[in-house]
Each structure stands twice: as structure tokens, then as C-alpha cells.
């Protein structure tokens, strides 16, 4: 019996020695290297993030999954703690977690357990107006519910749902609804344009729309006060990752985004694996994924049910795009 047990342990060693106790790749859905075979272009394997074993639960930072408590500080404090400790996992357990913007930092895996719903607040004031890029142009928008900038080795994984509360933000065109749906929406509040064909959630949202000649980017808005007046029009993308490397989105669901859902910009080594994106059929600018000026990306095993484009591959627009000069390259969609 002792000899047989020893033989079993020795046989198992080759399988466990490839992953250090202190750090390990976290993908639960292994990527078959055959995906790189017979490509019409040369492409390196997309690098996957690896994280230390350290982990924290947001509940220990005071977060409450009751759907009423605003957990912005608790979630971001947990992320900062893991980042400062050298990396690991931030666990969002079962519950409904109301929050404002979440900023992901390097070496952090934001992991959602089953029956975890991360619901972003519909309070526009919770989202600061920041310089960004939208529709390929430099502009200002509200900070995204989920964001990262100049980060490396980051992930959002697990089984949970991220709900952008987009109905609070989006205008709705009459032609996209039935008569009863339209009447119900109008009675709920908000304002209509002069032709009564588009519903806006606030007067500020309508004012922002009127300031746009094209591409949803306002013109002639100069002071901070003027920008604040149209805050409701500055709908953020649900997830904005900028200039980040080794990015993984896996297993989770993103839904009901205020504008585009997922927008990696100038990122490298991106894996989108086994996720769902769900936006209503009437969602204005409700793209699922806009991959912009990115290099080395896998978009695999995922479902995109969007109110607009499912997948867009782009590299900026007009003078702004030419000045950036970053093509989108080495992308596999399967």
C-alpha cells in the first residue's frame, strides 16, 4: 500500500510542478494552440496573465451585497490592496453589489462568484468627466464603470454579471419600439426632441445631442460648467482599457451598457474567452466589442447579442487616428 501511494504521488508531480504555489495562470478554459495554425499572417501566441495566489473578498472591506449600499470605495480599496501586495484575486461573492466606477490595477484578477451581480449606479454625478477617445476621436466622456489605464496583467473572470444600468443613460429612437413601449417610455419622464422621434433621459442629454454634428462628439463645449451641463449625454463605454497589456476577460457576462460595451484601446495581448455581452435591441450605440488600435488578440467562444455592431475592429478616425498611427493587428475571432 505504501509503495502504491508513493507511485501515485510521483506520477502526479509532473502535472503540478508546472504551476508554482505562489502564482498560477488562471484560465479555466484552456486555449488550444491549434488556433494559431494555418493563419494567413504571422502572429505570436497571445500572452496570458498570471497572478499570485493572494486573494481578498470585498466583504472584508465593508462591501454589502444588498443592492442598496454603494460599494465603490470598498471594491476599489480591495483592488488597491491586492495591487500593493504584488497582485492576486479580488473576489466578488454572491449578491447584488451596487457601485460606481471600478478602476482595475496591474496584477489584479477581479473574480465574480456565481450569482454575483455588479450593478453600476444610475447617478450621473458618480462618473467624473475625463479626457478620452470615443468614436475614434479625442473628446471628453464620463468615466467608464470599469476602466484600466497603463495596466499589465489584469483580468475579469468568474461567473458573475456586470450591469451597466444603460437605460438610465441612453436615448431611444421611436422607430425601435412598439407604440405601447414608446408611450410607456415617454410617460416615465425625460424629454423629446423637436420632432418627437427621439427620447432623452434628461434635458442635458438632449442639449449634448444638439451640440454634436457627427459621431456623438460635442462641439463648441469649452468650459467645465458647459461640459457638466451635458453630463448625461456623455455616456461612457461600460469597459475601457487603455494602453494595457496581458488582458483577460473570461466567463462573465456584461450587459446593458450606456454606450459601447467593451472598448480596449491601444492594448496588447488581449484574450476574450467564453463571455457574454447582452444589450437591448433598442440600445443606441450598443456595440458589444470595439477593438481599437490593439495588437495580438483572441476573441473566442463568446456570445455577442448587441443592439448595434457585434464586433468592430478599428484604428481611430480622421486626423486623430492618423496622429495615433496604431493599426489593429494580429486578431483571431473564432
Predicted regions and their residues:
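Right-handed parallel beta-helix
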Residues: 114-115, 152-160, 245-255, 268-280, ...
Amino acid at each position: 500500500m505504501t509503495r502504491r501511494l508513493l507511485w501515485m504521488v510521483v506520477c502526479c508531480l509532473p502535472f503540478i510542478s508546472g504551476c508554482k504555489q505562489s502564482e498560477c495562470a488562471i484560465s479555466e478554459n484552456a486555449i488550444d494552440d491549434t488556433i494559431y495554425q494555418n493563419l494567413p499572417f504571422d502572429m505570436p501566441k497571445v500572452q496570458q496573465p498570471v497572478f499570485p495566489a493572494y486573494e481578498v473578498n470585498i466583504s472584508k472591506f465593508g462591501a454589502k451585497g444588498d443592492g442598496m449600499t454603494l460599494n465603490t470605495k470598498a471594491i476599489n480599496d480591495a483592488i488597491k490592496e491586492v495591487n500593493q501586495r504584488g497582485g492576486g484575486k479580488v473576489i466578488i461573492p454572491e449578491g447584488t453589489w451596487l457601485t460606481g466606477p471600478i478602476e482595475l490595477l496591474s496584477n489584479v484578477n477581479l473574480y465574480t462568484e456565481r450569482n454575483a451581480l455588479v450593478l453600476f449606479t444610475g447617478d450621473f454625478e458618480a462618473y467624473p468627466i475625463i479626457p478620452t477617445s470615443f468614436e475614434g476621436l479625442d473628446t471628453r466622456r464620463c468615466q467608464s464603470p470599469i476602466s484600466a489605464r497603463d495596466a499589465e496583467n489584469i483580468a475579469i473572470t468568474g461567473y458573475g454579471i456586470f450591469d451597466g444600468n444603460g437605460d438610465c443613460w441612453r436615448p431611444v429612437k421611436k422607430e425601435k419600439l412598439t407604440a405601447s413601449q414608446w408611450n410607456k417610455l415617454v410617460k416615465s419622464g425625460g424629454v423629446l426632441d423637436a420632432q418627437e422621434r427621439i427620447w432623452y433621459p434628461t434635458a442635458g442629454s438632449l442639449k449634448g445631442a444638439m451640440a454634436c454634428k457627427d459621431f456623438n462628439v460635442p462641439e463648441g463645449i469649452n468650459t467645465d460648467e458647459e461640459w457638466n451641463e451635458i453630463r448625461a449625454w456623455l455616456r461612457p463605454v461600460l469597459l475601457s482599457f487603455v494602453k494595457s497589456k496581458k488582458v483577460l476577460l473570461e466567463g462573465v457576462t456584461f450587459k446593458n451598457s450606456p454606450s459601447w460595451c467593451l472598448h480596449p484601446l491601444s492594448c496588447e495581448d488581449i484574450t476574450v474567452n467564453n463571455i457574454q455581452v447582452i444589450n437591448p435591441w433598442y440600445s443606441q450605440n450598443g456595440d458589444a466589442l470595439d477593438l481599437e488600435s490593439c495588437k495580438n488578440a483572441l476573441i473566442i467562444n463568446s456570445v455577442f447579442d448587441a443592439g448595434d455592431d457585434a464586433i468592430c475592429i478599428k484604428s481611430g478616425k480622421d486626423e486623430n487616428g492618423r496622429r495615433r498611427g496604431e493599426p489593429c493587428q494580429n486578431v483571431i475571432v473564432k
